[in-house]
C-alpha cells in the first residue's frame, strides 16, 4: 500500500501538470474551436490543495489561512 507522502506527491505533480496545460497563454495550451476558451483550474484542485495545506503554492487558490 503506498504511503500518504507518495500519494500526496503524485497528486501535487498531477495538479501542477494539469494547471500548466490549461493556463492561458502558455505555449503548450491547446486551442479550442468555437465559443470555448481556455479556463483556469477548477475548484476541485484548489479544494485539494487547501486541504493538504499547499494552497500557498497556487496563486489562483484562495484558502483561508493561506501562507504568503
Curated annotation (Swiss-Prot):
Extent of the signal sequence: 1-27
One GO CC term on file: host cell postsynaptic membrane
Localization annotation: Secreted
Alphabetically ordered keywords of this record: Acetylcholine receptor inhibiting toxin, Amidation, Disulfide bond, Ion channel impairing toxin, Neurotoxin, Postsynaptic neurotoxin, Potassium channel impairing toxin, Secreted, Signal, Toxin, Voltage-gated potassium channel impairing toxin
UniProt propeptide residues: 28-39, 65-68
Known tissue expression: Expressed by the venom duct.
Positions of disulphide bridges: 46-61, 50-63
Keyword Secreted in annotation: yes
Keyword NADP listed: no
Gene Ontology molecular functions: acetylcholine receptor inhibitor activity; potassium channel regulator activity; toxin activity
Arginine amide carried by residues: 64
Primary localization class, coarse: secreted
Domain notes: The cysteine framework is XIV (C-C-C-C).
Function according to Swiss-Prot or TrEMBL: Highly inhibits both nicotinic acetylcholine receptors (neuronal (alpha-3/beta-4) and muscular (alpha-1/beta-1/epsilon/delta) subtypes) and the voltage-gated potassium channel Kv1.6/KCNA6 subtype.
Family to which the UniProt record says this protein belongs: Belongs to the conotoxin J superfamily.
Name the record gives this protein: Alpha/kappa-conotoxin-like pl14.2
Natural source organism: Conus planorbis
